Amino acid sequence: MCIRDSPNVTQNRLNSLIDLMKNETIDGQRVIDKPIFRDRLLSIQGRLMAQQSNALRILSSQINKEQDANLAKAIVKLQGTELRHELEGLAIDAMGELGTLYEDSPHLRDNGAWQMTYMYYLGLIIGGGTNQIQKNIISERALGMPKEPKIQGA
């Protein structure tokens, strides 16, 4: 698992998102007080807690040498990438029109870090099929599904 994807780093990013949502307003109301945004935030928070528990389970398996943790790592990697993309997307939505800014602007929040990180995780999800590869590994190793057939002549 990449340091950038660790549950602790994601927790720090979630805390920054909460601060952002407390400061941004839509129609004079704080974003964090709007139910649709708060529901999305709580969903992300719950998924992060599950990811933190899985990371501890992996660590415990490695320390106690109980079982191979490679499959659990693949699941955490897949979930972590999707979670971070969703977290960054919520921040962009919370900023409203300012969330669409990407480069130099006097209104840019956090020097565009939310937008850049959103695009980074989008790249991990679709670039080279990274998430699809993780899903294939999980389906083949955990569920015992057959491997994808190889195309002749490719």
Give the role of each language-model region.
Residues 4-154:
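Alpha-helical interface subdomain recognition
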Residues 1:
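Sequence context surrounding c-type heme c attachment/ligation sites in exported
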